[in-house]
Amino acid sequence: MTDSTPEAGAEGEFTPVKPQESELLVVTGMSGAGRSTAANALEDHGWYVVENLPPQMLTTLADLVARTPNSLPKLAVVVDVRGKAFFADIRDSLNTLAASGISYRVLFLDASDNTLVRRFEQGRRPHPLQGDGRMLDGIAAEREILALLRDSADVVVDTTSLNVHELANQVTGLFSDSGPVVLRLTVMSFGFKYGLPVDANYVADVRFLPNPHWVPALRPHTGLDQDVSDFVLIENDANEFVTRYVRALGPVLEGYRRENKHYATIAVGCTGGKHRSVAVSVELAKRLAQLPRVTVSTKHRDLGRE
């Protein structure tokens, strides 16, 4: 927001070390407009986020970061302005940053009065400036206090018509340099005899496949061994199942991206988690890794338990 050149200050003044290596974003706005949602979206895309920082501590934090280059390349500070005293603090802090040559941007989140009232009522919480009066009185007071800050913000996002996923996507688009959302998938094999994985988003049951356990030569081996993998995938045509399953997961994964979901676990289960589920999981992970904007890891939860 600022490109001011710092002046030599007297002893005890705020004089950060240059050059500044970190990107500083100040997130503020109306209560109920989505500051926490914005903070979560930024954190998911590599920002170090400090929430509910008292405005008077902003310069101290910025100075600390400036003195440790590359420690926090992207720092977002969520400032909660409650009352005229705090507004004076943030105004003074931002002026100090500007005078000291520290560049920053301000993201201001706003929403209509009716939307803010509805959100507070849904959360069954009072507005922080409401006191003993009406909620609309508190909103009006906050809007008056923040008017100048809103006018000087680098980016103003009106969240009136946005749900949490849409807001997160908009913030990500504005302040993320990492490109399209990459979905991190974990393909996990498991044995039903040991229970379902509690963190699985999807579960595939491959107990319909012939069990290598009943083949004496294969019983001591696992689904990581080539002979077991060939038995499961080739001799019994599990490849067709994997092909259809990947095809079915395609629109699901795309929907996850639209909803700003970054992680998903796909579990594949057989009886003991040793043969069939392991072989199928390895092949499934290979196929999923070929999809765009996807990274895949495998985990064999119950391998070695028998």
From Swiss-Prot:
What the entry lists under Gene3D superfamilies is as follows: P-loop containing nucleotide triphosphate hydrolases
Its domain of life? Bacteria
- Record key words, sorted: ATP-binding, GTP-binding, Nucleotide-binding
**Does this UniProt record's set of keywords contain Signal?**
no
Amino acids binding GTP: D80, V81, R82, G83
Binding residues annotated for ATP, in chain numbering? G29, M30, S31, G32, A33, G34, R35, S36
Stated family: Belongs to the RapZ-like family.
**What function does this protein fulfil?**
Displays ATPase and GTPase activities.
Its name, as the record gives it, is: Nucleotide-binding protein RSal33209_2275
